[in-house]
A protein has these predicted regions:
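Core catalytic alpha/beta fold that binds nucleotide/phospho-ligands
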Residues: 1-144
Length: 144
Protein backbone atom coordinates (compact mmCIF):
# COMPACT_ATOMS: atom_id res chain seq x y z
CA UNK A 1 0.00 0.00 0.00
CA UNK A 2 1.41 3.39 -0.97
CA UNK A 3 1.16 6.51 1.14
CA UNK A 4 -1.27 9.20 0.09
CA UNK A 5 0.40 12.29 -1.38
CA UNK A 6 0.85 15.20 0.98
CA UNK A 7 -1.80 17.89 0.63
CA UNK A 8 -0.71 20.81 -1.51
CA UNK A 9 -0.53 24.32 -0.07
CA UNK A 10 -1.50 25.60 -3.53
CA UNK A 11 -5.11 26.57 -4.14
CA UNK A 12 -6.96 26.24 -7.44
CA UNK A 13 -7.45 29.47 -9.36
CA UNK A 14 -10.69 31.33 -8.63
CA UNK A 15 -13.27 31.62 -11.40
CA UNK A 16 -12.90 35.41 -11.48
CA UNK A 17 -9.43 36.87 -11.48
CA UNK A 18 -8.63 40.36 -10.27
CA UNK A 19 -5.21 41.94 -9.79
CA UNK A 20 -4.81 43.89 -6.57
CA UNK A 21 -2.27 46.35 -5.21
CA UNK A 22 -2.81 44.76 -1.80
CA UNK A 23 -1.67 41.27 -2.71
CA UNK A 24 0.57 39.38 -5.08
CA UNK A 25 -0.88 36.28 -6.73
CA UNK A 26 1.53 33.47 -7.57
CA UNK A 27 0.75 30.97 -10.31
CA UNK A 28 2.67 27.79 -10.94
CA UNK A 29 2.82 25.15 -13.63
CA UNK A 30 4.58 21.82 -13.34
CA UNK A 31 5.61 20.83 -16.86
CA UNK A 32 5.22 17.15 -15.97
CA UNK A 33 1.48 17.78 -15.64
CA UNK A 34 1.15 19.45 -19.05
CA UNK A 35 0.25 17.24 -21.98
CA UNK A 36 1.43 17.89 -25.51
CA UNK A 37 2.51 21.50 -25.84
CA UNK A 38 1.58 21.57 -29.55
CA UNK A 39 -2.00 22.46 -28.58
CA UNK A 40 -0.69 25.48 -26.68
CA UNK A 41 0.87 27.02 -29.79
CA UNK A 42 -2.52 28.49 -30.70
CA UNK A 43 -2.18 30.92 -27.76
CA UNK A 44 1.14 32.28 -29.04
CA UNK A 45 1.56 35.14 -31.49
CA UNK A 46 3.32 34.39 -34.80
CA UNK A 47 6.43 36.12 -33.42
CA UNK A 48 6.37 33.92 -30.30
CA UNK A 49 5.83 30.81 -32.41
CA UNK A 50 8.90 31.79 -34.42
CA UNK A 51 10.91 32.25 -31.24
CA UNK A 52 9.79 28.81 -30.04
CA UNK A 53 11.09 27.24 -33.25
CA UNK A 54 14.53 28.77 -32.63
CA UNK A 55 15.06 26.64 -29.51
CA UNK A 56 17.20 23.62 -30.39
CA UNK A 57 16.79 21.88 -27.03
CA UNK A 58 13.30 20.36 -26.77
CA UNK A 59 12.96 20.94 -23.01
CA UNK A 60 13.79 24.66 -23.40
CA UNK A 61 11.34 24.99 -26.30
CA UNK A 62 8.65 23.34 -24.16
CA UNK A 63 9.37 25.70 -21.23
CA UNK A 64 9.05 28.68 -23.57
CA UNK A 65 5.77 27.51 -25.14
CA UNK A 66 4.14 26.58 -21.83
CA UNK A 67 5.44 29.70 -20.07
CA UNK A 68 4.24 32.07 -22.79
CA UNK A 69 0.86 30.31 -22.96
CA UNK A 70 0.49 30.55 -19.19
CA UNK A 71 1.44 34.22 -19.29
CA UNK A 72 -1.08 35.01 -22.04
CA UNK A 73 -3.92 33.00 -20.45
CA UNK A 74 -3.52 34.55 -16.98
CA UNK A 75 -3.10 38.09 -18.34
CA UNK A 76 -6.07 37.64 -20.66
CA UNK A 77 -8.26 36.80 -17.67
CA UNK A 78 -6.93 39.79 -15.71
CA UNK A 79 -7.43 42.25 -18.59
CA UNK A 80 -10.70 40.85 -19.95
CA UNK A 81 -9.14 40.22 -23.36
CA UNK A 82 -8.62 37.20 -25.54
CA UNK A 83 -5.15 35.63 -25.10
CA UNK A 84 -3.99 36.64 -28.58
CA UNK A 85 -5.20 40.22 -27.98
CA UNK A 86 -2.81 40.64 -25.06
CA UNK A 87 0.11 42.70 -26.35
CA UNK A 88 3.50 43.23 -24.80
CA UNK A 89 6.15 45.91 -24.66
CA UNK A 90 9.70 44.99 -23.78
CA UNK A 91 12.18 46.65 -21.48
CA UNK A 92 15.71 47.27 -22.85
CA UNK A 93 16.96 43.94 -21.47
CA UNK A 94 14.00 42.05 -22.96
CA UNK A 95 11.73 41.70 -19.92
CA UNK A 96 8.10 41.67 -21.09
CA UNK A 97 5.43 43.92 -19.65
CA UNK A 98 1.86 44.55 -20.69
CA UNK A 99 1.59 47.11 -23.46
CA UNK A 100 -0.14 50.30 -22.29
CA UNK A 101 -2.92 49.74 -24.86
CA UNK A 102 -4.24 46.74 -22.93
CA UNK A 103 -3.16 47.56 -19.39
CA UNK A 104 -5.87 49.81 -17.98
CA UNK A 105 -5.61 48.12 -14.58
CA UNK A 106 -1.88 48.81 -14.26
CA UNK A 107 -1.20 45.08 -14.02
CA UNK A 108 2.36 43.98 -13.35
CA UNK A 109 3.79 40.50 -13.68
CA UNK A 110 6.97 38.48 -13.69
CA UNK A 111 7.70 34.94 -14.85
CA UNK A 112 10.48 32.49 -14.00
CA UNK A 113 11.19 28.89 -14.92
CA UNK A 114 13.70 26.24 -13.96
CA UNK A 115 13.91 22.52 -14.72
CA UNK A 116 10.25 21.88 -15.40
CA UNK A 117 8.66 24.37 -13.01
CA UNK A 118 7.19 27.69 -14.15
CA UNK A 119 6.02 30.37 -11.71
CA UNK A 120 4.38 33.71 -12.38
CA UNK A 121 3.56 36.60 -10.04
CA UNK A 122 0.81 39.15 -10.77
CA UNK A 123 -0.33 42.30 -9.00
CA UNK A 124 -1.62 45.80 -9.74
CA UNK A 125 0.12 49.15 -9.31
CA UNK A 126 3.24 47.65 -7.73
CA UNK A 127 6.42 46.08 -9.04
CA UNK A 128 6.63 42.31 -8.67
CA UNK A 129 9.40 39.82 -9.15
CA UNK A 130 9.63 36.08 -8.75
CA UNK A 131 12.35 33.49 -9.16
CA UNK A 132 12.37 29.71 -9.07
CA UNK A 133 15.49 27.59 -9.00
CA UNK A 134 16.00 23.86 -8.95
CA UNK A 135 18.18 22.75 -6.05
CA UNK A 136 20.59 20.02 -7.05
CA UNK A 137 21.20 17.71 -4.14
CA UNK A 138 22.72 18.70 -0.85
CA UNK A 139 25.90 20.61 -0.38
CA UNK A 140 28.46 19.20 1.97
CA UNK A 141 29.78 22.14 3.93
CA UNK A 142 32.79 20.07 4.97
CA UNK A 143 33.86 19.92 1.32
CA UNK A 144 33.74 23.70 0.99
Amino acid sequence: MSAAPAPSPWQPAPMELRASSEQVDVWRCDLQRVGDEAGLLRWLSPLEQGRAEEYRVASKRREFIVGRSMMRLVLAKLTGREPLDVSFAYEPKGKPQLDASCNTGEITFNLSHSRGMIVMATAARRAVGIDVECVRGRLSFEKL
